[in-house]
């Protein structure tokens, strides 16, 4: 019968233990879960933002490629125009027509190259900035400084290709 008797010390210890669990739950566990949920929501928001930035970068790249294509078409039109003009001038004076056609073609090629270089530089600058912003938002607070730098270097190398 001693086995089934209630030991007052054991009951008090059990109540103290339950009270301690309740305190720990209120003071540590619930705030910790709340903090983790906020962090999860923040990361999910940053992932959504990163996806938006990636889509914007793709749109900018697409627009730059379209501008480059238009520049090539314009250059071809300039070249075609220069060729027809040079044919007319050749009829009047062969020497003068040949020099003028070469000058027009040279200017057209220089303009094409200039526009091409500007478009490529613009695309690379925008893509690099977006990649850095994207990486910084995604990596903010999740990696140590060395890991951030290595990841950023990797992203920049990929965009430079």
Curated annotation (Swiss-Prot):
Molecular function via GO: proton-transporting ATP synthase activity, rotational mechanism; proton-transporting ATPase activity, rotational mechanism
The subcellular localization recorded is: Cell inner membrane
Q: So where does this one cross the membrane?
A: 10-29
Read off the Pfam families from this record. ATP-synt_B
Q: Which InterPro entries match?
A: ATP_synth_B-like_membr_sf, ATP_synth_b/b'su_bac/chlpt, ATP_synth_F0_bsu_bac, ATP_synthase_B_chain
The record's Gene Ontology cellular component field reads: plasma membrane; proton-transporting ATP synthase complex
Show the HAMAP family listed in the entry: ATP_synth_b_bprime
Protein name (record): ATP synthase subunit b
Q: Which organism is it from?
A: Fervidobacterium nodosum (strain ATCC 35602 / DSM 5306 / Rt17-B1)
